[in-house]
Amino acid sequence: MSGFDDPGIFYSDSFGGDNAADEGQARKSQLQRRFKEFLRQYRVGTDRTGFTFKYRDELKRHYNLGEYWIEVEMEDLASFDEELADYLYKQPAEHLQLLEEAAKEVADEVTRPRPAGDEVLQDIQVMLKSDASPSSIRSLKSDTMSHLVKIPGIVIAASGVRAKATRISIQCRSCHSTLTNIAMRPGLDGYALPRKCNTDQAGRPKCPLDPYFIMPDKCKCVDFQTLKLQELPDAVPHGEMPRHMQLYCDRYLCDKVVPGNRVTIMGIYSIKKFGLTSNRGRDRVGVGIRSAYIRVLGIQVDTDGSGRTFAGAMTPQEEEEFRRLAALPNIYELISKSIAPSIFGGTDMKKAIACLLFGGSRKRLPDGLTRRGDINLLMLGDPGTAKSQLLKFVEKCSPIGVYTSGKGSSAAGLTASVMRDPSSRNFIMEGGAMVLADGGVVCIDEFDKMREDDRVAIHEAMEQQTISIAKAGITTTLNSRCSVLAAANSVFGRWDETKGEDNIDFMPTILSRFDMIFIVKDEHNEERDVMLAKHVITLHVSALTQAQAVEGEIDLAKLKKFIAYCRAKCGPRLSAEAAEKLKNRYIIMRSGARQHERDSDRRSSIPITVRQLEAIVRIAEALSKMKLQPFATEADVEEALRLFQVSTLDAALSGTLSGVEGFTSQEDQELLSRIEKQLKRRFAIGSQVSEHSIIQDFTKQKYPEHAIHKVLQLMLRRGEIQHRMQRKVLYRLK
């Protein structure tokens, strides 16, 4: 090791050093010329039909519009010069700079002479696009570092647009010497200022350590933005958390996406410093550790909220197959049979879910307002009736599906939350479940277990299909164009026929936003029980055998693509005859509901309003969309009315108080009033008493037991009394 300390002679191989540098520069110049040749000479079309110079014309058009960018397809570059495309794929950071310089030279040639005031040539940003199959975030390992990658995902957070210096000038505080035009590396890498000033000034003392500072007014900057990308839900293995990746966008790629967008990213898999320090900055560990991010070179937004996840990736053969499928006369029954085939019964409910998956047509009115096309559905009733299983199936079947449970969902988790960005300390917004499901379906299980405050938060998302946020200085509106499929139990766990509408513990404001409300009862029917038991046992016995396609069913992958195709290609409207029929039936429906309210002397908790008329329109449009028809016919309206009849109308009339359990007469009303007054006399405010003893005492006085239950339920709903000690004791509040 003594040779390293020898101050005598220093040997170096100086031969060929300059030549090597010259060769590197010559290679870069040659590659730049080839890139320039590609941009100038690449053409589309044939000599017979006429051809155009694709990138040359695009550069000229964009430059004249003041848009200093161009999108290059990797397939075009590979067909022109495969070696160049290979260089760009394996060493994108180095060769992209040459491509941008070449684009700037071509832009200079095609835009001369430029108008007065615009003589200075602007830099051109090159964005990349490719038809190659994307890889997942999980597949990005160290061997793909600094390579070009293409990954899909959902944008869940976006920072504000900030400035980053591309060229800086620094000045010494002591001797005021300056170093100008220092190039900065693109991406999230910083720049380490020189520790010493190397200016030779005879007769002056040496400059101190760390003398340089940046001169902000002499720096050249570009816009940049950081995004947070999350794995697609269907790409996450069971039982694992979705992974995230930080994205760096600059110049014209800023503000191209918002949280909730499904995107495919083309970029360079890069690393940045990942300093691990203790609280006071001492004991640095992990010096060699780097955290990964992607420097974005191209963004493709996969969906515009219409569920077009698969529509662009379909072959002509698939499209032809789907058109033949839609032309089948029994397509409606075929689709409803394919909805959760392992679940027995519930035919009408499956047909309603089929309508929800296809959806109606979103309409934009001349005054700028919109009418939603998505259908919302509520399943309400007994436990053990496969409600959650249906929700799980719809999540898998929908082109975009998000499943959440009511108890574990907050208002912010469903809509959007505002968080502080750890790097910039600014507030940023992260979209919740209803924003991430834009263009698909949100499945909310245990809807009745949600807190009322959280349930109110989705009112706007269900009807207006937007989420308005005004928090921490951020005021904005996010899109949530999605259907809501909710499942809930009744107030008493099981549906109690004697309680009527008291089984439903939802406000009319939320119930009116559901297009269809199904009451699912576990009825005791021996014949049905035999068939159900046989079906369930068959499922358990044949669960491990190889899956075989059942005749008359569409398999899940094909159904998912068919739904996406229909949603993308078809937007039907009501025909004139169907509209007239619907108008007449709606008037009859309203009068029937009004008569029922008059007879029962109370307002129904499930109202029949204009929203329900629009619901029937949407159901009819969905039925027409399954057949890829431009207009909904009278038959579609008839089926939509039937579905509405067996769901919402039956639910609205389920609380009928006529017959044995009824209180429709004046005598019954007086009986209720008498029981309530006597109950309040012996039950002081602030006291508590056993519910069982009250019922026993009043029964001894010859009052009917169902009437006593009715009074207690009314007082509970009005908030005058409340249950305590596992619903055994009643406590009077007012």
Swiss-Prot record:
Catalytic class of the enzyme: hydrolase
Domain MCM: 331-537
Gene3D superfamilies (alphabetical): 2.20.28.10, mini-chromosome maintenance (MCM) complex, chain A, domain 1 (3.30.1640.10), Nucleic acid-binding proteins (2.40.50.140), P-loop containing nucleotide triphosphate hydrolases (3.40.50.300)
The keyword Signal appears for this protein: no
Biological-process GO terms, alphabetical: DNA replication initiation; double-strand break repair via break-induced replication
Residues recorded with modification N6-acetyllysine: 392, 396
Domain of life, per lineage: Eukaryota
Gene Ontology molecular function, alphabetical: ATP binding; ATP hydrolysis activity; DNA replication origin binding; helicase activity; single-stranded DNA binding
Transmembrane segments: none
Key words of the record: Acetylation, ATP-binding, Cell cycle, Chromosome, Cytoplasm, DNA replication, DNA-binding, Helicase, Hydrolase, Nucleotide-binding, Nucleus, Phosphoprotein
Primary localization: nucleus
Motif Arginine finger, residue numbers: 512-515
Protein EC: 3.6.4.12
Transport among keywords: no
An example Gene Ontology CC term for this record: MCM complex
Reactions accelerated catalytically: ATP + H2O = ADP + phosphate + H(+)
Residues engaged in binding ADP: 371
Localization of this protein: Nucleus; Chromosome; Cytoplasm, Cytosol
Residues the record lists as N-acetylserine modifications: 2
InterPro entries referenced in this protein's UniProt entry, alphabetically: MCM (IPR031327), MCM5 (IPR008048), MCM5_C (IPR054125), MCM_CS (IPR018525), MCM_dom (IPR001208), MCM_lid (IPR041562), MCM_N (IPR027925), MCM_OB (IPR033762)
Pfam families listed in its UniProt record: MCM, MCM5_C, MCM_lid, MCM_N, MCM_OB
Record PTM Phosphoserine, positions in chain: 605
Family: Belongs to the MCM family.
Protein's job: Acts as a component of the MCM2-7 complex (MCM complex) which is the replicative helicase essential for 'once per cell cycle' DNA replication initiation and elongation in eukaryotic cells. Core component of CDC45-MCM-GINS (CMG) helicase, the molecular machine that unwinds template DNA during replication, and around which the replisome is built.
Record note on quaternary structure: Component of the MCM2-7 complex. The complex forms a toroidal hexameric ring with the proposed subunit order MCM2-MCM6-MCM4-MCM7-MCM3-MCM5. Component of the CMG helicase complex, a hexameric ring of related MCM2-7 subunits stabilized by CDC45 and the tetrameric GINS complex. Interacts with ANKRD17. Interacts with MCMBP. Interacts with TONSL; the interaction is direct.
Protein name per UniProt: DNA replication licensing factor MCM5
Organism from which the protein derives: Bos taurus
